[in-house]
């Protein structure tokens, strides 16, 4: 069912003598009829932002014509209508449409003979219209001056129409209504502003969360890169240590002080020149290592005092990034590196001892700091591990107390090599075993390798093998267990390491008491294996003859 009809159309239908035709498809029930309600727009287009009108208020605005008499049409004259039209004309306003409808209604009423009113009635109507027009202008000016209030913001029409059923309402009621409208508008604007603030807070919280997460991710990535670089640096140092192991074994074989003059006398000038060149090379290497140590100590702020001679700052254990940048800038401006001293060979022991004593302060502080961090991360250990509850520095001091035992471990000969100028140890004779009697083997003394001490050597094979074992375990721990090739390589590396540590010596294979044989490899692409054995054809023939009791060739037997 359509909405309320304008006044002109109602008058036209009343004056039309023809009967109206009923639409059979029209819905007689008003409650179930479909309604199309236009947007209620009473203000000018140039004013503030529009407010969203809810469905309940739209229904309330549609029924205003039925409940309030002010929204119904009223009689007026053409002169008054023209004055009102020209004074209130604004582009795009809804008043033009209303005035056009009223004008069309007046023209229709004039054409239908509605000029039967008396002049007195028309004058009274004109005066009343002029008074209403002045009041409307005053109300518009008041609404324009009042900040934060506009006609378009009026949305609560039920409160606006309370107590206004009569046309002759007083100004006090109008003031109260305007106050109620302003209060409603303030509540609506306050509610919207709170929603906007909540949205802004949510957006700010999201921004903070995103920023925090990005910062956290970047920090974790930076830590991962630092750990990766540390592992790569440790691998390079370990590789250098592995290469130095061969040089260490060769150094242990050099002539010792008691026989060195004899080698020097018998070596002649060639031996003396080689000795002089090696002495210069070792001196240059020692200076390079000391220079590298000074460079590394100077680059790190916590160890710079060891090089430039300043006092250590024990309070500052960690330096922030900003302080580190300032230190780098100052270092670029002026780098105070101590003058390099050319030390003699006899000065290096005292210099290195003093450097180590100064470095001990920083070493102990760093060890204690990281020990505390790992202890907090791993939690408190059980009562059974009381030794680990002590400080890391206490444990180190306890181990270093027995220096003689530690020195004996470095002076113990663990590898098989011969020191030049020393006689070879006499081999113990192996007693022959008579037939029918059990074989007698020489009894080796218990822990014989620990009794082979030499004060002129330095042997740390136990520590070296421990480093190799840890390296192999770390390299192979990240392998896929399903990768058979990688597992095979790991097994070969472990077996090679074990063969270096413990050599398998078969004592029963001496003096020809055990047959030695070589297993030939399988055929590959119909190619016979290459014979790497040292036996010639005559030895093989003699071997096969001895197996079957034929010690002499067959032709010799027939000749006899």
UniProtKB/Swiss-Prot annotation:
It is found in: Nucleus, Nucleolus. One of its GO terms (molecular function) is RNA binding. Residues 273-315 are annotated as: POLR2J binding. Part of the small subunit (SSU) processome, first precursor of the small eukaryotic ribosomal subunit. During the assembly of the SSU processome in the nucleolus, many ribosome biogenesis factors, an RNA chaperone and ribosomal proteins associate with the nascent pre-rRNA and work in concert to generate RNA folding, modifications, rearrangements and cleavage as well as targeted degradation of pre-ribosomal RNA by the RNA exosome. May function as a general inhibitor of the histone deacetylase HDAC1. Residues 76-208, 309-333 are annotated as: Disordered. Residues 316-372 are annotated as: RB1 binding. This is Protein AATF. InterPro entries: AATF, AATF/Bfr2, AATF_C. Belongs to the AATF family. Residues 156-165 have a biased composition (Basic and acidic residues). The modification Phosphoserine is found at residues 61, 63, 150, 155, 203, 273, 316, 320-321. Coiled coil: none annotated. Hyperphosphorylated during the G1/S phase transition. The lineage of its organism: Eukaryota, Metazoa, Chordata, Craniata, Vertebrata. Pfam families: AATF-Che1, TRAUB. It comes from the Eukaryota. The keyword Phosphoprotein applies. GO terms for biological process: cell adhesion; embryonic cleavage; negative regulation of amyloid precursor protein biosynthetic process; negative regulation of apoptotic signaling pathway; regulation of mitotic cell cycle; ribosomal small subunit biogenesis. The modification N-acetylalanine is found at residue 2. Its main location: nucleus. Keywords: Acetylation, Nucleus, Phosphoprotein. Residues 94-129, 168-195 have a biased composition (Acidic residues).
């Amino acid at each position: 069912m359509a909405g309320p009809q304008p006044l002109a159309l109602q008058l036209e239908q009343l004056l039309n003598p023809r009967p109206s035709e009923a639409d059979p498809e029209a819905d007689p029930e008003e409650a179930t009829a479909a309604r199309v309600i236009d947007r209620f727009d009473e203000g000018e287009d140039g004013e503030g932002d529009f407010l969203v009108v809810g469905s309940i208020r739209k229904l309330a605005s549609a029924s205003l014509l039925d409940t309030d008499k002010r929204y119904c049409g009223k009689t007026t004259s053409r002169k008054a209508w023209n004055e009102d039209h020209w004074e209130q004309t604004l582009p795009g306003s809804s008043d033009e449409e209303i005035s056009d409808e009223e004008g069309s209604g007046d023209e229709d009423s004039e054409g239908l003979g509605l000029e039967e009113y008396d002049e007195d009635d028309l004058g009274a109507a004109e005066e009343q219209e002029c008074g209403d027009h002045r009041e409307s202008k005053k109300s518009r000016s008041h609404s324009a001056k009042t900040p934060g209030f506009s006609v378009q913001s009026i949305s609560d029409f039920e409160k606006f129409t309370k107590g206004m059923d009569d046309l002759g309402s007083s100004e006090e009621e109008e003031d109260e209504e305007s106050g109620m409208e302003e209060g409603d508008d303030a509540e609506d604007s306050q509610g919207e502003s709170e929603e906007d603030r909540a949205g802004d807070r949510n957006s700010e919280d999201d921004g903070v969360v995103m920023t925090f997460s990005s910062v956290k991710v970047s920090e974790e990535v930076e830590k991962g890169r630092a750990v990766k670089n540390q592992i790569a640096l440790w691998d390079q140092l370990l590789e250098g240590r592995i290469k130095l192991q061969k040089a260490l074994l060769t150094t242990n074989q050099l002539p010792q002080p008691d026989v060195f003059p004899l080698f020097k006398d018998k070596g002649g000038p060639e031996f003396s020149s080689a000795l002089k060149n090696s002495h210069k090379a070792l001196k240059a290497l020692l200076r390079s290592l000391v220079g590298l140590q000074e460079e590394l100590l100077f680059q790190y702020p916590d160890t710079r005092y060891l090089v430039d001679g300043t006092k250590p700052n024990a309070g500052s254990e960690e330096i922030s990034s900003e302080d580190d940048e300032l230190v780098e800038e100052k270092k670029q401006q002026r780098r105070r590196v101590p003058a390099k001293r050319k030390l003699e060979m006899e000065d290096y022991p005292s210099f290195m001892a003093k450097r180590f004593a100064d470095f001990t302060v920083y070493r102990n502080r760093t060890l204690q700091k990281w020990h505390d961090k790992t202890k907090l991360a791993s939690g408190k250990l059980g009562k059974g591990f009381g030794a680990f509850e002590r400080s890391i520095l206490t444990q180190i001091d306890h181990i270093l107390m027995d220096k003689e035992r530690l020195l004996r471990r470095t002076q113990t000969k663990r590898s098989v090599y011969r020191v030049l100028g020393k006689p070879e140890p006499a081999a113990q004779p192996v007693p022959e075993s008579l037939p029918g009697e059990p074989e007698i083997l020489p009894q080796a003394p218990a822990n014989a390798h620990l009794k082979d001490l030499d004060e002129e050597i330095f042997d740390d094979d136990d520590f070296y093998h421990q480093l190799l074992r840890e390296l192999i375990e770390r390299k192979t721990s990240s392998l896929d267990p399903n990768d058979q090739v990688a597992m095979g390589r790991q097994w070969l590396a472990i077996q090679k390491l074990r063969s270096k540590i413990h050599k398998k010596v078969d004592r029963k294979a001496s003096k020809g008491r055990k047959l030695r044989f070589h297993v030939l490899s399988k055929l590959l692409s119909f190619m016979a294996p290459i014979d790497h054995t040292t036996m010639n054809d005559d030895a093989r023939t003699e071997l096969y003859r001895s197996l079957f009791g034929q010690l002499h060739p067959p032709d010799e037997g027939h000749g006899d």
